A protein has these predicted regions:
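Hot-dog-fold acyl-thioester-processing enzymes
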Residues: 2-81, 144-164
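HotDog/MaoC-like acyl-thioester-processing domains
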Residues: 3-14, 95-164
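Short, conserved secondary-structure segments in the cores of folded domains
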Residues: 8, 54, 84, 89-90, ...
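Well-ordered beta-strand positions in beta-sheet-rich domains
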Residues: 19-21, 87, 132-136
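Short, basic and Ser/Thr-rich N-terminal targeting/leader segments
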Residues: 82-84, 116
Length: 164
């Protein structure tokens, strides 16, 4: 049985980092649209998106925030982390087929409330920044090693979006 392990405030070191790489698919874009309710045609409609400044469908900017959130909650610090704030600057569009490497790096620790400040970034397959920012979390003080939950199964069905 697979487990997850956190890093407690005392274990975390300045400069410590965690990263994950994700390849963007049309299914990812559709799933994010469903979960967020953001059905802007720039994300879902090829014909509409072709007429935008990006010349095609783009991933939702906040998808980057969601992946950064997963790094914080699963890897560094991991289970038991309390997410306090996040700032993000979107540097360039992310399109289907892009491979984005997200990284969080500890830059500051505040002993009084067990606060950890992390630089956050996402870089595409060409080494170009797509997102930059900072996260502030309250790190766990107790060691946790929970069983890793199974990834949920999801089925996508295309449904016409009707404006009211």
């Amino acid at each position: 049985m697979a487990t997850m392990e956190n890093r407690t405030f005392d274990e975390i070191a300045i400069g410590e980092s965690a990263e994950v790489t994700r390849e963007v698919t049309r299914a990812d874009i559709s799933l994010f649209a469903v979960v967020s309710g953001d059905v802007n045609p720039a994300h879902l409609d090829d014909a509409y998106a072709a007429g935008t400044r990006f010349k095609g469908v783009i991933m939702h900017g906040m998808w980057s925030g969601a992946i950064i959130s997963s790094l914080l909650g699963v890897h560094l610090p991991g289970p038991g982390t309390i997410y306090l704030s996040q700032s993000l600057a979107f540097k360039r569009p992310v399109t289907p087929g892009d491979r984005i490497t997200f990284k969080v790096t500890v830059k500051e620790k505040r002993e009084d409330k067990k606060i950890v400040v992390l630089d956050c970034s996402g870089v595409n397959q060409d080494g170009k920044a797509v997102v930059e920012g900072e996260a502030v979390v309250m790190a766990p003080t107790e060691k946790l090693v929970p069983v890793a939950p199974a990834e949920p199964a999801v089925t996508i069905e295309t449904v016409a979006y009707v404006r009211k």
